[in-house]
Swiss-Prot record:
Pathway: Amine and polyamine biosynthesis; betaine biosynthesis via choline pathway; betaine from betaine aldehyde: step 1/1. GO terms for cellular component: peroxisome. GO terms for molecular function: 3-aminopropanal dehydrogenase (NAD+) activity; aminobutyraldehyde dehydrogenase (NAD+) activity; gamma-guanidinobutyraldehyde dehydrogenase (NAD+) activity; nucleotide binding; protein homodimerization activity; sodium ion binding. Dehydrogenase that catalyzes the oxidation of several aminoaldehydes. Metabolizes and detoxifies aldehyde products of polyamine degradation to non-toxic amino acids. Catalyzes the oxidation of 3-aminopropanal to beta-alanine. Catalyzes the oxidation of 4-aminobutanal to 4-aminobutanoate. Catalyzes the oxidation of 4-guanidinobutanal to 4-guanidinobutanoate. A motif (Microbody targeting signal) lies at residues 501-503. This is Aminoaldehyde dehydrogenase 1, peroxisomal. NAD(+) binds at G238, S239, S240, A241, T242, G243, S244, K245, C294, E393. It comes from Pisum sativum. The keyword Protease does not apply.
Length: 503
């Protein structure tokens, strides 16, 4: 049965609105290269309307509608949204799959996480009520001080195409739990499920303007949103190059930003491991989500004594991965998201080969798939640390391999990068794992696994992988400002100045 993609408009102030310039962008299914629909293309004029709607939502009834309402009221809406998503899970999963090429089983698992994320932040919204007016211990008993946590205000949420609904939720759920009003700008390459969230918000009666969804091109809708003077904070997930531009724009207005950017994460494999078990984790860490993960452990650093045998096993695992239309049962690798990204991935592989690297397996379109932006899982050896394939993010199913002889050498290879998002260490020596968890320069360290993420645990990087943390309590704090309230409690005058003479 054909999957129907609804023709949505922009979601602004609780209503569907045609873009002022009436522009639209075609949706291309990366598995078939066929147009499956289109999305509205917002411009500055539409962004202005969305920001105005968010401002009104914050201030309506002196905030009692949303920003100053109880956390328990906001939690009810978040749970209602979660319930609707759960109800529509199968439909949303298929839409996600044909929109961005994600294997259906992955898309459905993402939606389970979406539901759990809204429910988790509903709980934190309720807890926020009891944490208000937390007292501060002071050295002077003539003063009493406490803390208020208040929503930052209007927030711009700019999200990527590799986890369209899930990464939007990582931002939306905590922002709304905090009492902010948001404008979501998803990637133009994968906006379909994010637009469906607008319909869900209508169905649950979310107050107007609390969540606005503007789709469109980055240089039009995204840039207008990032530079808008009435946006109080920007949260961005995407490339380091775009993140740098957003940071520069925000600096002109001294505006806070949270950035989750690119990565070139290492996976360090020591000689004492179970080779088959670690081979699967290594393949999963790099090729999951079609290799399009910002935290992909795409630099394998393996002990020289096991390198030949281990890489041979990796090749067998990689060549056994089912590559197919993502809607097919058992698909474990779908297409790259777009033609431009597909060409970029192939160019990176070609560049590595021209620089002297060896393509052990993959590096091309699978023979059985004549259409779609498919790339076989690719393993590259004979790599030097100066090669582009070792230093720059590919965002495709490509693993580069180097060997090491000592623990110190492994650490130096792992940390020799501008990025610092994820990292993994594989060893049965837990003391060694502990040493590396401290030595690796990354926001996340996985021990004897790769890529697990949990709503309760912080997610984010260091160096050029950005700053700020999403998920867990840290995700909520992203959207809260801290206000100190201090009261003088003594009946005595302050007594700093000599009082004026009484005539």
């Amino acid at each position: 049965m054909a999957i129907t993609v609804s023709s949505r408009q922009l979601f602004i102030d609780g209503e569907w609105r045609v873009p002022i310039l009436n522009k639209r962008i075609p949706n291309i299914n990366p598995s078939t290269e066929n147009i499956i629909g289109d999305i509205p293309a917002a411009t500055k004029e539409d962004v202005d309307l969305a920001v105005d709607a968010a401002k009104r939502a914050i201030s309506r009834k002196n905030g009692r509608d949303w920003s100053a309402a109880s956390g328990s009221l906001r939690a009810r809406y978040l749970r209602a949204i979660a319930a609707k998503i759960k109800e529509k899970k199968d439909e949303l999963g298929k839409l996600e799959s044909i929109d961005c090429g994600k294997p259906l089983e992955e898309a459905l698992a993402d939606l389970d996480d979406v539901v759990a994320c809204f429910e988790y932040y509903a709980g934190l919204a309720e807890e926020l009520d009891s944490k208000q007016k937390a007292p501060i211990s002071l050295p002077m008993d003539t003063f009493k001080s406490y803390i208020l946590k208040e929503p930052i205000g209007v927030v711009a949420l700019i999200t990527p195409w590799n986890y369209p609904f899930l990464m939007a939720t990582w931002k939306i759920a905590p922002a709304l739990a905090a009492g902010c009003a948001a404008i979501l700008k998803p990637s133009e390459l994968a906006s379909v499920t994010c637009l469906e969230l607008g319909e869900i918000c209508k169905e649950v009666g979310l107050p107007r303007g609390v969540l606005n969804i503007v789709t469109g091109l980055g240089h039009e809708a995204g840039a207008s949103l990032a530079s808008h003077p009435d946006v109080d904070k920007i949260s961005f997930t995407g490339s380091s190059a775009t993140g740098s531009k957003i940071m520069t724009t925000a600096a002109q207005l001294v505006k806070p930003v949270s950035l989750e950017l690119g990565g070139k994460s290492p996976i360090v494999v020591f000689e004492d491991v179970d080779l088959d078990k670690v081979a699967e984790w290594t393949v999963f860490g790099c090729f999951f989500t079609n290799g399009q993960i910002c935290s992909a452990t795409s630099r394998l650093i393996v002990h020289e004594s096991i390198a030949v045998e281990f890489v041979d096993k990796l090749v067998k695992w990689a060549e056994n991965i089912k590559i197919s239309d993502p809607l097919e049962e058992g698909c474990r690798l779908g297409p790259i998201v777009s033609e431009a990204q597909y060409k970029k991935v192939l160019n990176c592989i070609s560049s590595a080969k021209s620089e002297g690297a060896t393509i052990l397996t993959g590096g091309r379109r699978p023979e059985h798939l004549k259409k779609g932006y498919f790339v076989e899982p690719t393993i590259i050896t004979d790599v030097t640390t100066s090669m582009q394939i070792w230093r720059e993010e590919v965002f495709g199913p490509v693993l580069a391999v180097k060997t090491f002889s000592t623990e110190e050498e492994a650490i130096n290879l792992a940390n020799d990068t501008h990025y610092g998002l994820g990292s993994a260490v594989m060893s049965n020596d837990l003391e060694r794992c502990e040493r590396l968890s401290k030595a690796l320069q990354a926001g996340i360290v996985w021990i004897n696994c790769a890529q697990p993420s949990f709503i309760q645990a912080p997610w984010g990087g260091i160096k050029r992988s950005g700053f700020g943390r999403e998920l867990g309590e840290w995700g909520l704090e992203n959207y809260l400002s801290v206000k100190q309230v201090t009261r003088y409690t003594s009946d005595e005058p302050w007594g700093w100045y000599q009082p004026p003479s009484k005539l």
